[in-house]
């Protein structure tokens, strides 16, 4: 490919992803943590104000930092928040991951809880981002990391949004939640990797884990939510026909558990939302809903 053609392709890609060639682009950085050079991508929209919110996005097992959740950059352009895509460390299988206590992660020394907290503090200080309005989302293995953070650091993030995430059995049995946290989960009922009804016998090899509704009810109870509202999202119409039936739009049922304890002193009541994607697969479910828009809609409720 000649240099002119290469430049043309790069410009077209930038226009497609960011909307115009003058838009900001994610940048690659490293961060030293426990003798490891950890990588991350950082997106700072043009015109970002001081004390802007920060959203951290975690990839799935074996993934790359920006493999999922890229559309949050488009939301960030409009809403003016920073987006960080950290990279998981490599495990014994040579796969990038978040250390959440899968059976095959036994002996893995990586402390991702500490890494994410220290990386967030670094970004807040370096770029003048909000310490209060920092949020966490992630898909699959990244979703499991979100749940682990909810147990161990509920006061660090203003709200948490696991996507196709699980609560491993050991988390439920061995950890005592240190408080409530606004939480939303998006999960397909036909997910073949992270089963909606759980895997108590560990047939999938990820370790035993509980059913998604039970996992979510943990945080409903922690928040002492007093009532549930159930709505169906409008069916999404794809502009381009899908070539895979698995990616056809699905009905999404939103369960909102409300009336919880104050999210902070004199703050709004804590809420927990569950997006039940009927027949949905193991994905960000963006073929069925505007997932990144919904994530920000939830996070925005907890800005203070």
Walk through the language-model features, giving the residues of each:
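Bacterial N-terminal signal peptides that target proteins for export
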Residues: 1-9
